[in-house]
Amino acid sequence: MIYDSIVIGAGHAGIESALILAKKHNTLLITGSLKQVASLPCNPSIGGPAKGVVVREIDALGGIMAKATDLAQIQIKMLNSSKGPAVRALRAQIDKLEYPQIILEILQNTPNLTLLEGLVNNLIIQKNQVQGVCLIDGRKINAKTVIITTGTYLASQILIGDTKKASGPNGVPTTYGISTQLKEIGFEVIRLKTGTPPRVKKNSIDYSQTKIQMGDNLEQTFGFLTPQTTKRPQEPCFLTHTNQTTHQVIRKHLNQSAMYGGYVEGIGPRYCPSIEDKVVRFCDKNSHQIFIEPESLYLNEMYLQGLSTSMPQHVQHEILKTIPGLQNAKITKYAYAIEYDAFNPNQLKHSLETKKIQNLFLAGQMNGTSGYEEAACQGLMAGINASLKLQNKPPFVLKRNEAYIGVLIDDLITKGAKEPYRLLTSRAEFRLLLRHDNADLRLKDYGYQLGLIDKKDYNSFQNKKAKINLLLEKSKNYEILVNSDNLSYLKQQNSASLGEKTTLAQLIKRPELNFCTLQHFLQEKADKTIYEQVEIQIKYEGYIAKAQKEAQKLARLEQKKIPSKINYADIKNLSKEAKEKLDLIKPQTLGQATRILGVNQVDISILLVYLEKHHALL
């Protein structure tokens, strides 16, 4: 039997790929262990700055992460709620036992999708085109497309102190065949590192020495159509801090750390450093935050966010004894570092298909990213583009002004990765356009056009969009007269009086007024989220228009295509570094070329002149 597609790995990238492909194609999902499907080997949370927006983008395009998160969440918060809408994002603590179970049940009940427990040894490749896979037991399985989403399981090693063990997270076996084969073909393999903190028994913590961190009482969910009936009581988190005594212990044993003892080859994540890294790099700080987070409603176990380390086990005990609330904490699982093989993503097209091998796609942490959300959105896009390839249709590529997903993939392809890449709001030049609140308005039309959103969901979205447009129009035309009722209302809101009549749209631009003012005057039946959307579009109208204008400028550069057969060595006055980088990345547009490190504005001007002069010949 020949499958339309094989997905290797059932982590957060693999499940999104498989579910998208199974909507239209006969798909095989291969995993080393069905018990590890959608596992959460690091923090038991989904979302956060930029990442939370990505989860909503995944939902708008028909992915599963948002829905599963809503069902498994045990605490939810809106981050940066006091700041502007461009940086707001949801973050949820999720039950690490429930989440994988929810995903597994969905996979098992998905038509066109077969689950197989096994390990892939290598790929079947003929004439630079992937044809299927070979398992370590000798079985060969053919497929028209293959997506590799092996996460941190390629040639992975667990490190604690001076001990090394060949293993993936949670004791799942590592594999070497795929990375060895791709290296022999000519792929650039990079060695990366990440880590995880110790877990401790819930009932061994002295919570009186910590500060409780409750969730927010929100109506919002990650999924745009998640019913409110899924809500349940929230679990608290707790905050404590390291201190100078903690730091003395760490400095004393620094050479015993796997990282500082010289046992780690891989490069670690810049934005999620180990506790020993924090102590060394930020020596002026007297303390560092440690968040104590529940792992599950069904486990007597807490996760110590901020205490990632590769120190020996006895040192981990010593460190805990110095931290308020954790002096008598019993460790249930020791912290460790893990290093693994990944592939520099500049070897991929924007569709996430490899440049060297046709019909082979790579997605997730193996592309040099960190985080469940970054992995999931890559899996989604690889699944969509593998499906389009099977249908002989052009790839689906999101622009930087359309989605954080577009920012992430463009950064990976254009700049490559030498360290684990984390998505940040600061990476998006159009972040005011890429908000948490408008992910469906930006992307759901695409989801429907691609056949990923059903008619019922799309009709619900269309109704929402119509309601927003109606309220926007009414706000612009609704006159606020200077009368006693209106003046009294403004006084109650601590807002300045009116000297002359105005429109509701003009009034709502006052910083002290919000969507409640819209509800007060319009009296239209609509969800709070709809009123909030109208408020944002009115209040930030000028800034949004400016961002859209800048996006249009970028679009003009993106429309200037660079022919694939161009020879950069022939372009006089182009810097040597620019020639090397352009030849390596092979940008498809002038816009992409502007974002390549080592290519400056002078190089772009020279390239533009060359393209215009030699247009007919290329």
Swiss-Prot record:
Q: GO cellular component terms? A: cytosol
- UniProt cross-references to PROSITE patterns, sorted A to Z: GIDA_1, GIDA_2
- UniProt keyword annotations, A-Z: Cytoplasm, FAD, Flavoprotein, NAD, tRNA processing
Domain of life per record: Bacteria
- A Pfam family of this chain: GIDA_C_1st
Can you supply a Gene Ontology BP term from the record? tRNA methylation
Kindly list the positions annotated as binding NAD(+).
Answer: 268-282
Which coarse location class applies to the principal site listed for this UniProt protein?
A: cytoplasm
| GO MF annotations in UniProt | flavin adenine dinucleotide binding
The entry assigns this protein to a family as follows: Belongs to the MnmG family.
| Subunit structure of this chain's protein | Homodimer. Heterotetramer of two MnmE and two MnmG subunits.
Q: What does this protein do?
A: NAD-binding protein involved in the addition of a carboxymethylaminomethyl (cmnm) group at the wobble position (U34) of certain tRNAs, forming tRNA-cmnm(5)s(2)U34.
- Tell me the NCBIfam families matching this sequence: mnmG_gidA
The record's annotation in PANTHER family points to:
GLUCOSE INHIBITED DIVISION PROTEIN A (PTHR11806), PROTEIN MTO1 HOMOLOG, MITOCHONDRIAL (PTHR11806:SF0)
- Recorded protein name is tRNA uridine 5-carboxymethylaminomethyl modification enzyme MnmG
- Annotated organism of origin: Aster yellows witches'-broom phytoplasma (strain AYWB)
Encoding gene per record: mnmG
